[in-house]
Amino acid sequence: MSRSSKKGPYVDIKLLDKIEAMNKANEKRVIRTWSRDSTIFPQMIGHTIAVHDGRRHVPVYITENMVGHKLGEFAPTRFFRGHGGKKADKRGKVK
């Protein structure tokens, strides 16, 4: 179920404060965050945000097309390595 439209989009307040402070100071640096559920706002365009995927922080450069989406959409948490079998064993070996 999606969020109620009367509540508005969610964004972590600390993350938004960091973005606004960087916009005022006109600086660009990577911001680490664990807030995968935060919505991307227009103020975030041009910044790089390192989103936690459960193991490490994945750098995500914010563009105009990403506005309205969630940060977690751009940092996948699961990686498909393929099904088992003889062919998979040969492909998976590191020489």
From Swiss-Prot:
<protein>
    <recommendedName>
        <fullName>Small ribosomal subunit protein uS19</fullName>
    </recommendedName>
</protein>
<dbReference type="InterPro" id="IPR023575">
    <property type="entry name" value="Ribosomal_uS19_SF"/>
</dbReference>
<dbReference type="GO" id="GO:0003735">
    <property type="term" value="F:structural constituent of ribosome"/>
</dbReference>
<dbReference type="GO" id="GO:0015935">
    <property type="term" value="C:small ribosomal subunit"/>
</dbReference>
<keyword id="KW-0689">Ribosomal protein</keyword>
<dbReference type="InterPro" id="IPR005732">
    <property type="entry name" value="Ribosomal_uS19_bac-type"/>
</dbReference>
<comment type="function">
    <text>Protein S19 forms a complex with S13 that binds strongly to the 16S ribosomal RNA.</text>
</comment>
<dbReference type="InterPro" id="IPR002222">
    <property type="entry name" value="Ribosomal_uS19"/>
</dbReference>
<keyword id="KW-0687">Ribonucleoprotein</keyword>
<dbReference type="GO" id="GO:0005737">
    <property type="term" value="C:cytoplasm"/>
</dbReference>
<dbReference type="Pfam" id="PF00203">
    <property type="entry name" value="Ribosomal_S19"/>
</dbReference>
<keyword id="KW-0694">RNA-binding</keyword>
<dbReference type="GO" id="GO:0019843">
    <property type="term" value="F:rRNA binding"/>
</dbReference>
<dbReference type="GO" id="GO:0000028">
    <property type="term" value="P:ribosomal small subunit assembly"/>
</dbReference>
<keyword id="KW-0699">rRNA-binding</keyword>
<dbReference type="InterPro" id="IPR020934">
    <property type="entry name" value="Ribosomal_uS19_CS"/>
</dbReference>
<dbReference type="GO" id="GO:0006412">
    <property type="term" value="P:translation"/>
</dbReference>
<comment type="similarity">
    <text>Belongs to the universal ribosomal protein uS19 family.</text>
</comment>
